Each structure stands twice: as structure tokens, then as C-alpha cells.
């Protein structure tokens, strides 16, 4: 069985139908709801039934996969629409990892959420077992019907966070289950690889209440004459919206009617024409937005050219562009410097923030294409422009940029570039001229500024305790080690050694504190070897 994350829509549905997983899942669901008088299944593990909630689960260790079945009592109609709001800062939120800067909170289906949290101890133990199973490369299927399927979905979301990227992800299969989250959760999951781990089997005669709760994952909608798989959540809503019967529905006959081949959406006569047209239009709009981004990327090259020209002009007057920009922010005098800040830098920041948002919004297969197309341009932008944002940040009297002030889009651009393992960037050829190099670590100047703040504390604080002084001095030594590492790797621009740079200001103060203690960096600086750094040999 392939990892569900590698499959889309109808492909996932076809795999599950032809593999017999639906019948296997449903038969085990029937067993947990109507247990036989005797069961000699050696691979069966049964949880103790929760007296307070009625939640139960069983583990079936089959030859080819492990199946976890959740069972829950029917929902009271009075509470079927209740929701629980979870915020990223809530201590009792078991899903803080789903929250983001754009979506700091979301709501869950209260009956399912209460059942899930009531069995936290048992489910934690189950998680440990399943992680070991996944490490053995045996697929894990998590399933349930009605409210049991809703709890299975919550459990799968919780389990997915702890699974290593190299392992197969579990597949969650639900049957006629209430939706578990609001529009915020839907938006969070459609941006995530987690979305491909859910297959919801629903009879076309079933009507699911969607006025507040919204669908995610893939839906296998079963008609009398066949079935279709749909990922488009708007189409799912149009086809299934209505009142939901919260009880357990027998899907045995539904599964028996399924053809062994999936109907393709384009050829299907089971879906109204207006729904199909809506799906096609939304797909077209996504592609149009995709194309516009590539066109805009070419426009951004003009602003990058201005910044590169600015960097070159600064170097001609023996000052790095970081320090020139910082000085002009404090004492603006040149119109060109002002334009760099207010027009070119701002335009580039807006564009790249939108790129990151678009990548995070897209399915993983599309996102990987987008990231590859934008990879090098985004990396050059980050290394060129983030130092200018850092200059603004510290001019406002702030500190610790890397941990408290860095924009999310810079973090993601750096992460994506690192994930690609670009061998070209691993090591600079010793014979190559580095005069135009952009420092690899775009937070370098933030590290310099923080070290200058530490030096100022050491020089100006009266009566400082010895332990505090030791901690601050250790920070300077750590920064020295960091600087020496990127120098030896040839990953830092020679501009840092210009006499008026903030780094040289740091060095002049640091060597007073360092005294006669020698190190690789002090020998490099004191003998002025830095003057030949980066020159072709």
C-alpha cells in the first residue's frame, strides 16, 4: 500500500476500494458494535470501555496492515451542533501545532472533542504502540463510523504531528461521520499534507449539517450506481449539505454496490453539471493565481536590481550597504536611500510574503513545484533584504531578532532552501572571489547587534554580579565561534571587514574584553588576514 500522502482524490479512492480496505474497516466496525460471543482473533487488542463517556477502540493486527477501530455512542440531538473554540495559547489545547500566525484558533465538534480528551491516557499509550508499528513500515488504518469516525479523525490529526517525515502516514477512513471542525480548521488542513490522510465515506442519501462545521480531506460519495471521489470542499458542501442523522448507518449494502473501478469526475453523470462547472472554475482560478505569481516574479527583478546597485554604490565609499542603510534610517538625507526603504524593499517584502502564503495554502504536490520555481530567487531576496529589515528592527531599540522579531516568511524561505540540499551552496571554492557574495546567514547582522548590546551591558553596568558577567561573556565567546565558523566556510561577505562596519566596531570592543587570550579569530583579525579574505587566489 502506498503512502496516502502521495495520492490525490480519485486515486486514493480507487486504491482503497480495490484493496478491500473499506470492507475490512466496515467489518471491524460492525464487530466492535456487535461483538460475537467468542473471539479467537490472536491479533485483537481491546481497550477498556470508558464508563463515563462510552468511547472504545480495538486494535486488529492483520497480515498486511494494522487496523484501529473507534466506537462511540450516538450523539444527543441537543448537543450535535455544539463547538469548542481552541486557541494556540490554550493550555488544554491538544492541537496547538495546527495553529499558525494566520489561523491562531479554530473550533472543534464538542461531542467528538470531549470523547477524545476523556480518553487521553489510553490514547497516549495507543500512540506509542502505533509509532512503533509505523517504524516497522506496516501501514496503519484508523477507522470509525458516525461519532466514532469523528473521534478517529481527531486522533489521526493528533498522531500525525509525532510521525517522522520518513515514515508512512496513517490513513483515516470514516463512515457517515459528523464533521469535526470549522472553516478555520478547514483552511489549516487544506494547506497541509495532513489533508491527504483522510478518506470520508458517505452515502449520497446522507445529509451532513455544514452550516458551521466544514469538510476536509477526500470524500468518497456513494450513489446507487457507483461512487465518486471529490477533494473540492465547496462541491462536497453542495452535494451533501443538510440535516445529519447522528446514529450509526449500515454501510454494508453501500459497499456491496461499489464498482471495482472508480468513475472519473469528468465523465460522471452522478454529479450535477453546475457543481462540476464550479469545481472547474475554482481550479482555473487557482492556476491563474499561480501564473500571475510567476509574472510578478519577473517584475520583482527590477527592485532587486536597484538594491544590488545600492549595495555596489555603498561599497565604493567603503561602507557596507547594511550600515549605510542603518545610518540613513536614523538621519535620512538622500532621496535614493528613502526610495530603497519605502518603495523597493517594501514591494519585495509584500511579494515574497504573498508567495509564502500561497505555497502554504496549496496542496503539497503543487507547493513543491512552486517552491522549486521560486527557490533561488527567494533565497537571494532573503539574503539581500533581511539585513535591511534587521537594521530597522535594532534602530527601534529592540533585541533578539532571530527569536522574537523575525518574519515568518523569512523562516519558511530559509527552511525550504535548506530542505533542497543544494550542493552548490555547501562550500565555497577556495579560489573563487567572494566580493559579490551575500552572507549565507541572513540573520548575521542581528547576531552582531545582539553582541554589541552585550558588550554595552558589560561596559556600562555598575556592580554587575560575577555570575551575570560570566553569562554575558560566554555569549560573546559563542558569537566569536559562530563568526569563525562562517569565515572558515567562506559563507560571509568580505563587506563585514570594511573599517566602518558594525562588525569591526564589535571587534574593536571585543578585543579589549578578550585581552591577551588567543584564538583562531583573534589571530586572524590581529594579523589583518581578513584583508585578503574572499579574494581569488
Swiss-Prot record:
Catalytic activity reads:
a carboxylic ester + H2O = an alcohol + a carboxylate + H(+)
Which keywords appear in this protein's UniProt record, sorted alphabetically?
A: Cytoplasm, Hydrolase, Lipid degradation, Lipid metabolism, Membrane, Nucleus, Plant defense, Signal, Transmembrane, Transmembrane helix
> Which Enzyme Commission number(s) are on file for it?
3.1.1.1
What domain of life does the native source organism fall in? Eukaryota
Per the UniProt entry, the signal peptide is 1-27
Q: Which GO terms describe its molecular function?
A: carboxylesterase activity; carboxylic ester hydrolase activity
Identify the InterPro entries for this entry. AB_hydrolase_fold (IPR029058), EDS1_EP (IPR041266), Fungal_lipase-type (IPR002921), SAG101-like (IPR044603)
**Transmembrane intervals:** 140-160
| Annotated compartments | Membrane; Nucleus; Cytoplasm
Indicate yes or no for the key word Hydrolase. yes
- Disulfide bond residue pairs: none
The membrane topology of this protein is: Single-pass membrane protein
Gene Ontology cellular component terms for the protein in this record: cytoplasm; EDS1 disease-resistance complex; membrane; nucleus
What factors induce this protein? Specifically induced during senescence via a complex epigenetic processe involving histone methylation.
Primary location recorded for the protein, binned into one broad class: membrane
Instruction: Output the GO biological process annotations, alphabetical, semicolon-separated.
Output: defense response to Gram-negative bacterium; leaf abscission; lipid catabolic process; plant-type hypersensitive response; positive regulation of defense response to bacterium; positive regulation of defense response to oomycetes; positive regulation of defense response to virus by host; positive regulation of leaf senescence
Tissue spec: Expressed in senescing leaves.
Quaternary structure?
A: Part of a nuclear complex made of EDS1, PAD4 and SAG101, that can be redirected to the cytoplasm in the presence of an extranuclear form of EDS1. Interacts directly with EDS1.
| Function according to Swiss-Prot or TrEMBL | Acyl hydrolase that triggers the leaf senescence onset. Can use triolein as substrate to produce oleic acids.
Kindly provide the name given to this protein in its UniProt entry.
Senescence-associated carboxylesterase 101
Q: Which organism is it from?
A: Arabidopsis thaliana (Mouse-ear cress)
Top-down, what is the taxonomic lineage of the species of origin?
Eukaryota, Viridiplantae, Streptophyta, Embryophyta, Tracheophyta
Amino acid at each position: 500500500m502506498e503512502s496516502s500522502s502521495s495520492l490525490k482524490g480519485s486515486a486514493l479512492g480507487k486504491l482503497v476500494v480495490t484493496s478491500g480496505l473499506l470492507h475490512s474497516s466496515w467489518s471491524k466496525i460492525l464487530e466492535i458494535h456487535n461483538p460475537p460471543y467468542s473471539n479467537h482473533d490472536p491479533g485483537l487488542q481491546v481497550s477498556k470501555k470508558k464508563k463515563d463517556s462510552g468511547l472504545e477502540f480495538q486494535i486488529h493486527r492483520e497480515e498486511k496492515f494494522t487496523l484501529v477501530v473507534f466506537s462511540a455512542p450516538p450523539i444527543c440531538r441537543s448537543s450535535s451542533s455544539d463547538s469548542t473554540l481552541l486557541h494556540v495559547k490554550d493550555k488544554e489545547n491538544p492541537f496547538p501545532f495546527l495553529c499558525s500566525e494566520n489561523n491562531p484558533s479554530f473550533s472543534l465538534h464538542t461531542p467528538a472533542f470531549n470523547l477524545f480528551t476523556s480518553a487521553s491516557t489510553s490514547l497516549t499509550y495507543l500512540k506509542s504502540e502505533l509509532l512503533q508499528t509505523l517504524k516497522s513500515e506496516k501501514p496503519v488504518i484508523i477507522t470509525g463510523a458516525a461519532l466514532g469516525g469523528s473521534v478517529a479523525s481527531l486522533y489521526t490529526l493528533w498522531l500525525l504531528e509525532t510521525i517522522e517525515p520518513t515514515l508512512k502516514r496513517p490513513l483515516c477512513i470514516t463512515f457517515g461521520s459528523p464533521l469535526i471542525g470549522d472553516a478555520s480548521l478547514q483552511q489549516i488542513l487544506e494547506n497541509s499534507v495532513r489533508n491527504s490522510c483522510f478518506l470520508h465515506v458517505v452515502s449520497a442519501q446522507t445529509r451532513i449539517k455544514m452550516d458551521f462545521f466544514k469538510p476536509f480531506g477526500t470524500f468518497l460519495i456513494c450513489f446507487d450506481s457507483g461512487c465518486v471521489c471529490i477533494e473540492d470542499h465547496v462541491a462536497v458542501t453542495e452535494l451533501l449539505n443538510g440535516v445529519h442523522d447522528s446514529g450509526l448507518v449500515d454501510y454494508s449494502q453501500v459497499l456491496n454496490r461499489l464498482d471495482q473501478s472508480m468513475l472519473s469526475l469528468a465523465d460522471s453523470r452522478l454529479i450535477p453539471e453546475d457543481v462540476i462547472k464550479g469545481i472547474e472554475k475554482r481550479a482555473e482560478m487557482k492556476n491563474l493565481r499561480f501564473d500571475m505569481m510567476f509574472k510578478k516574479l519577473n517584475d520583482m527583478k527590477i527592485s532587486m536590481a536597484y538594491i544590488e546597485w545600492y549595495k555596489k554604490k555603498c561599497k565604493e565609499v567603503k561602507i557596507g550597504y547594511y550600515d549605510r542603510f542603518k545610518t540613513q534610517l536614523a538621519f535620512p538625507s538622500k532621496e535614493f536611500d528613502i526610495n530603497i526603504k519605502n518603495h523597493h524593499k517594501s514591494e519585495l517584502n509584500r511579494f515574497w510574503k504573498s508567495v509564502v502564503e500561497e505555497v502554504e495554502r496549496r496542496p503539497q504536490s503543487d507547493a513543491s513545484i512552486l517552491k522549486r520555481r521560486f527557490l533561488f530567487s527567494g533565497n537571494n531576496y532573503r539574503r539581500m533584504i533581511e539585513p535591511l529589515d534587521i537594521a530597522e528592527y535594532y534602530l527601534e531599540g529592540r533585541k533578539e531578532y532571530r527569536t522574537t522579531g523575525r518574519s515568518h516568511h523569512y523562516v519558511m524561505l530559509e527552511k525550504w532552501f535548506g530542505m533542497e540540499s543544494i550542493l552548490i551552496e555547501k562550500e565555497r571554492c577556495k579560489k573563487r572571489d567572494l566580493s559579490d557574495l551575500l552572507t549565507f546567514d541572513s540573520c548575521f547582522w542581528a547576531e552582531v547587534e545582539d553582541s554589541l548590546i552585550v558588550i554595552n551591558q558589560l561596559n556600562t553596568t555598575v556592580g554587575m554580579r560575577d555570575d551575570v558577567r560570566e553569562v554575558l561573556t560566554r555569549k560573546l565567546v559563542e558569537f566569536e565561534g559562530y563568526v569563525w565558523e562562517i569565515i572558515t566556510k567562506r559563507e560571509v561577505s568580505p563587506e563585514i571587514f570594511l573599517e566602518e562596519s558594525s562588525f569591526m566596531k564589535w571587534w574593536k570592543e571585543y578585543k579589549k574584553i578578550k585581552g591577551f587570550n588567543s584564538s583562531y579569530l583573534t589571530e586572524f583579525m590581529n594579523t589583518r588576514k581578513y584583508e585578503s579574505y574572499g579574494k581569488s587566489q
